Curated annotation (Swiss-Prot):
Residues 275-297 are annotated as: Disordered. GO terms for cellular component: cytoplasm; cytosol; glutamatergic synapse; membrane; type I terminal bouton. This is Endophilin-A. Keywords: Coiled coil, Cytoplasm, Endocytosis, Membrane, Phosphoprotein, SH3 domain. Residues 18-248 form the BAR domain. It comes from Drosophila virilis. The gene is EndoA. PROSITE patterns: BAR, SH3. One of its GO terms (biological process) is clathrin-dependent synaptic vesicle endocytosis.
Length: 369
């Protein structure tokens, strides 16, 4: 069996070279089959590209995607399961508005109240966006992935097998092999032709299922934008009320305080007890010398100005998205410690992850890592 299989592979290779280099004519398939082959090839590219672009549509930040992929890869290597959620821009803006709205104080500031209302609305929109992501992944991306790994893979397998059996059949026919060998090769060729045709036909004629997936995608987008529109409509009404409230508030009068209001000690302060400025010589400057003491100027040590950093001991070539490559002796700024074995850092305007064993820490991170 092993020898027969090797002989068949040699025959196929010989026939392929003969057709390409020697001008031998192989068995031609009809135009309908060639058209199905072309459409199947387009479908293969479509499914691959559609999955990629849909993921970019749902998660448009390439840096965040690379970081998530890197963390996922590191988690697999370290055996630790870490869930990393894509940071929705609505959620990031909501966090900013909520934080500073509360810092300003909602009790006395209508602006602070408006910021908090806006932040809460954006937070709702971020939650709706996460629901959209889950919906599209489950009802659109997963069927595409199944089609890619099952249906298309099976069809391409039959096509590859058909090509091999066609070469074997033409080789035996060209060399005028025994009738039973030619007949056996022809039967296998016919079998593969049948399987390839049926597989491509079923794939290309499955428009109902494919269009249904597009309908689900469109419905998910419509629901997302409808819910966001409802949230924004409510936010707009609330902000208009806050604006009217701010306009109706009486304007507070403000009187700047003087030094007397601060109850400063008059001795040596340039003021006498009755508040009258003491006599100042016209030749003397009323302000202290702008020159700073050399000892005080040197009080800020260079170590306080240094950022956490490390020096590369060896070259590191990244193998996964999100990893940071560098050369030996490069100085890398430390940004974060991912786990016991990996750092996040920056060098030459690039950021990413790298193993701890490749570097020597010079200035540690603030937490001592």
């Amino acid at each position: 069996m092993a020898f027969a299989g090797l002989k068949k592979q040699i025959n196929k290779a010989n026939q392929y070279v003969t057709e390409k280099m020697g001008g031998a004519e192989g068995t031609k398939l009809d135009l309908d089959f060639m058209d199905m082959e072309r459409k199947t090839d387009v479908t293969v590219e479509l499914v691959e590209e559609l999955q990629l672009k849909t993921k970019e549509f749902l998660q448009p930040n390439p840096t965040a995607r690379a970081k998530m992929a890197a963390v996922k890869g590191i988690s697999k290597l370290s055996g630790q399961a870490k869930s990393n959620t894509y940071p929705q821009p609505e959620g990031l803006l909501a966090e900013c508005m909520l934080t500073y709205g509360k810092k300003l104080g909602e009790d006395n500031s209508v602006f602070a109240q408006a910021l908090v209302e806006f932040g809460e609305a954006l937070k709702q929109m971020a939650d709706v966006k996460y629901s959209l992501d889950d919906n599209i992944k489950q009802n659109f991306l997963e069927p595409l992935h199944h089609m890619q790994t099952k249906d298309l893979k099976e069809v391409m397998h039959h096509r590859k097998k058909l090509q091999g059996r066609r070469l074997d059949f033409d080789c035996k026919r060209r060399r005028q092999a025994k009738d039973d060998e030619i007949r056996g090769a022809e039967d296998k060729f016919a079998e593969s032709l049948q399987l390839a045709q049926v597989g491509m036909f079923n794939l290309l004629e499955n428009d109902t299922e494919h269009v249904s997936q597009l309908v689900t995608f469109a419905e998910a987008l419509y629901d997302f934008h409808s819910q966001c529109a409802d949230v924004l409509r409510g936010l707009q009404e609330t902000l208009q009320e806050k604006r009217a409230e701010a306009e109706s508030r009486p304007r507070n009068e403000f009187v700047p305080k003087t030094l007397l209001d601060l109850n400063l000690d008059g001795g040596g302060g340039g003021l006498i007890d009755d508040g009258t400025p003491s006599h100042i010589s016209s030749s003397a400057s009323p302000l202290p010398s702008p020159m700073r003491s050399p000892a005080k100027s040197m009080a800020v040590t260079p170590n306080r100005q240094q950022q956490p950093c490390c020096q590369a001991l060896y070259d590191f070539d990244p193998e996964n998205p999100g990893e940071l490559g560098f050369k030996e002796n490069d100085i890398i700024t430390l940004l974060n410690r991912v786990d016991d074995n990996w750092y996040e850092g920056a060098v030459n305007g690039r950021t990413g992850y790298f193993p701890q064993s490749y570097v020597q820490v010079q200035v540690p991170l603030p937490n001592g890592n």
